[in-house]
Each structure stands twice: as C-alpha cells, then as structure tokens.
C-alpha cells in the first residue's frame, strides 16, 4: 500500500515510521511548495498533486489548515480519508461548533461574531467572562482573547476587528468561559466498517497555550462519557481514521472543547504506552485494514520539546525514557520533538518523571518540574 499525506511535518514523519513494518509506504505533499517529499529525509520525490494522487492507494492529512482547492481535488479522486467535511470542520470553529451541536455533544455556549453588533449580541448571549477564538487559523493558543470584564471590550474589539479584516471569510467564535478542573483528550480510530477503538483518556497540561505534558489516565466514568461523544462525532461524519476530541472536565462532566481530525499531539504517548500506536491505527483505518488494539500496556507520559534541539545525554541512560526528534530547524516555541516516559508498575512513572525533572531545565520544561513539586508534597 502507498499512502499520500497532505502535509510534510512530524505527523507524516511518524506515520512513515509506523507504516514501515506493515509495508505501507508514505509520501508527503508539501502544501506550500507543491513538492512531494519523503517524510523522513525531505528528499523531493516529485512535483504536482495530480501526479501524486495517481500513484497512491489512499490519501490522508496531517493537519486541518489545508487549502480547500487541494482538499477538493483529493476528494474527487475517491481516495481521500477522512472526508473533506471532517478536515474542514477541524479547520473552522464555526463548522466545528455546528457539527458538535448536530451530533448532540456537550460543548460550551457559543456565538459567531463578524461585526461589532454581533459582538454586543455575543456578550448578551454568552455573558462575561468569555473566551474569543478566531474561526480560521488559530491553534496552540494563537488567535485567542479573554474578555474578563466590560472595561476590555473596546480594546479586544479593535484587535478582533483587525483579525477579521485580515483574512477573507474570517470570523470570531465567542465561547462561554468554562471553569474546568482539568483538560483531557480522547484519541481513537474508526475503521471503514464503522468499528471504533479508543485509547485511554490523557490528562493534558498546557504552558502558554501549548501542550507540554500529556499522561494516560485510568478514569472509567470519564472514559465512558468520552467514548460516547467520540462515537457520536465519528459516526456523524462517517469518519475513517484517527480522530481526537479535547475536553474540559467540569466536576466529572466532560464538555468538548475542540476536535482534531487527525493523529494528535496528546496521542504521542501511544508509541510506547499502547498495544498499537495512533499512527499505525490511522494507517490501518485509511488502508481498510482491521484496527489494532488500543489497550494500555504501560503507564506513559509524553513531554513536548519546545524550541530546543539538544537534551542532556543523561536522558539516554534513563530507563523508560524514549526520545523522538522531528528533524526540524530550531525555532523559539517550535515543537522540535517529544519524550515518552514509561513505567511498568504503579508508582514507577511518577518516580521517573521526578528523575526527569532533575536533568531538564525548569525554564524550558516547567510542566515536568511542577509535576515533580506536586509529587513531593
């Protein structure tokens, strides 16, 4: 089997690594240059989307923000999975909110803003405090505002108006502020036959709006809620592939915050912690193969490496520590790689995370150090 991935970043890279044992070949389409590249070496293999489509058995995507004309060409080939509707929902918060409402899935009260009058109506409908997010292009905390009090209205509107004017068809989605206890996510896969397999929930810690630490957790009641909502969303889209739902945990009740129609950062722990990793299961799904087991085989946490291209060599000598570099050029705040930390018996993962904190810079890895502090109390 030969799969073309729209996008040539780290997710395509990790799909390639996961596909090799199954004899699934991966090529990546660089949306910016129009080149088809090898996802590991970035060697140019060809140019032009139409030629690439003819040479593969299936097409999928590693991110949501893909030009619609590219998606439409892929959809016409009959080889693209999941559907373009799913990708577009992940790339436009207006479509995403409508999808969640239509699927009957709990999410925060919301209102779409295109004009100053809409902003006033949103304040009346949603209330203050509220969170405001750009409908298009926002991710990892970008394109977001928090309206905490009426005194901020004029300043925030000026910034949002500039955002709306800068991009055709842009809008802002106002959401009710949700006082959540923690953020969790569910990554799962749906096959061509409608079968569903979900991984254990992961508890997520963000730093400046970017995921920094993700840990698989055992929470049966939350797991049941999350799986029900995952299935509702996936079935409504007739989804094929890996899908991620991000939730707010509000006193034991889950509300969907966002969906991601692709393999997801909070699922990277599955590379060492699950029977079948998310990347392999995505390829299994889009290639029409049976889904693999999502069973937890060891307690695992994932630590993002942000803006750094080196780590202390001591990590390589640590038991249960697995480093995954993405081969990227160093840039401040950029996701350069991740560390998976595993434990084989109760308490071992906590001990190893505390050991990790002793060798990692607290300014670069604050979430790991905060975890260690909490563990010592």
UniProtKB/Swiss-Prot annotation:
Nucleotide-binding among keywords: yes
EC number, UniProt record: 6.3.4.18
Signal peptide: none
GO CC terms in record: cytosol
One family name in Pfam for this protein: PurK_C
GO biological process: 'de novo' IMP biosynthetic process
GO molecular function annotation: 5-(carboxyamino)imidazole ribonucleotide synthase activity; ATP binding; metal ion binding; phosphoribosylaminoimidazole carboxylase activity
Binding-site positions, ATP: 93, 133, 138-144, 175-178, 183, 206, 257-258
PROSITE patterns for the chain: ATP_GRASP (PS50975)
Catalytic activity: 5-amino-1-(5-phospho-beta-D-ribosyl)imidazole + hydrogencarbonate + ATP = 5-carboxyamino-1-(5-phospho-D-ribosyl)imidazole + ADP + phosphate + 2 H(+)
Gene3D superfamilies membership: 3.40.50.20, ATP-grasp fold, A domain, ATP-grasp fold, B domain
SUPFAM superfamilies: Glutathione synthetase ATP-binding domain-like (SSF56059), PreATP-grasp domain (SSF52440), Rudiment single hybrid motif (SSF51246)
Annotated ATP-grasp domain residues: 97-287
Enzyme class: ligase
Pathway terms, separated by semicolons: Purine metabolism; IMP biosynthesis via de novo pathway; 5-amino-1-(5-phospho-D-ribosyl)imidazole-4-carboxylate from 5-amino-1-(5-phospho-D-ribosyl)imidazole (N5-CAIR route): step 1/2
Described function: Catalyzes the ATP-dependent conversion of 5-aminoimidazole ribonucleotide (AIR) and HCO(3)(-) to N5-carboxyaminoimidazole ribonucleotide (N5-CAIR).
Family classification: Belongs to the PurK/PurT family.
SUBUNIT field: Homodimer.
HAMAP family in alphabetical order: PurK
Listed name of the protein: N5-carboxyaminoimidazole ribonucleotide synthase
UniProt source species: Vibrio parahaemolyticus serotype O3:K6 (strain RIMD 2210633)
Gene name tied to this protein: purK
